[in-house]
């Protein structure tokens, strides 16, 4: 126990030094981490969302060097799931070609192939991060935190650099009154900021009270409703599970009351404005139900080639259902999702739902197993900060994060797994 505390104190002092060492010891991973917060660069003109972040271009060379130095290790179960999804993808390709005769078969093949590449790169980012040692992953986390903090300062000091089209931003920002950083939009940046705060809390071993207080304040300041509300849900969820029954009830009630007050005074007006003026509430709500419905009707997934056609097929019925109960919502945007051939903004707005649609139970079963296993490890290690970070990642990717051009989530998951394994090994020793 004493050794564990000493190592934590020592690691606080050496994380910054390890960033410099990382540059010379593992330059590809250094660059990979450095560019993770940049997920909307002009590199999109090369390969679309897949090359939105410079990290995507560094990923394959970095992985190649890592394999040469450490060898190749692949889980057979993951390979079986991968080929199973590919088989289902091709079967659904022929199904949707006949079901939607107005859809060009080349279009389905083209879009499905693009989704395939996007997810391959996304999971390779996770695999590459998992291959790092404890010092390098900690140094990478510290580097990402520094870049995100710098982007916040730049957003205030010279917002024109952030909001206007340039080499670091593929397009102009339509909401310059909000924070954007180096990311695609305010909601993604809010996710980056909260994840960075939680990463910092894990690295520095913050107290729970300090973590919750700082994160709530910063989450509100990010102007991202999704990030702030997801963290509030994390708090309520966490305290509803911990301690004795009366303690859990008391903390849960306090969390709910505080969350309600924050929601009422900081987010209710903005949410009402969204409902009256924009279509985001109707779009996100509709597509959340669409994603669940597609999964229930296709538990094995629809594969990469069935993703868009299944959305075309299921969305109109869900719109009619929601509209009958909430006619005041604006469905203009989500109506375009029913038009065969539309693809630019079509999606569930939830990475987890997208994975359920494409992979079905091939994703759901390993996902549930992983969550249960690692949360138990965090409990055994008394790592509340890691617990909060994982919960925030889950809720955010469930409700408002779906950007496959960003590798923030794969890195954070790898960071938590590597730290958990390292703690377990230290406890055994």
Curated annotation (Swiss-Prot):
Membrane topology category: Multi-pass membrane protein
Residues passing through the membrane, by range: 27-47, 48-68, 78-98, 106-126, 142-162, 198-218, 219-239, 249-269, 288-308, 351-371, 399-419
Keywords recorded for this protein, A-Z: Cell membrane, Membrane, Transmembrane, Transmembrane helix, Transport
Main location group: membrane
A GO CC term assigned to this protein in UniProt: plasma membrane
Locations listed in the record: Cell membrane
Function in brief: May function as a transporter.
Name of protein: Uncharacterized 49.5 kDa protein in cps region
Organism: Klebsiella pneumoniae
Upper lineage: Bacteria, Pseudomonadati, Pseudomonadota, Gammaproteobacteria, Enterobacterales
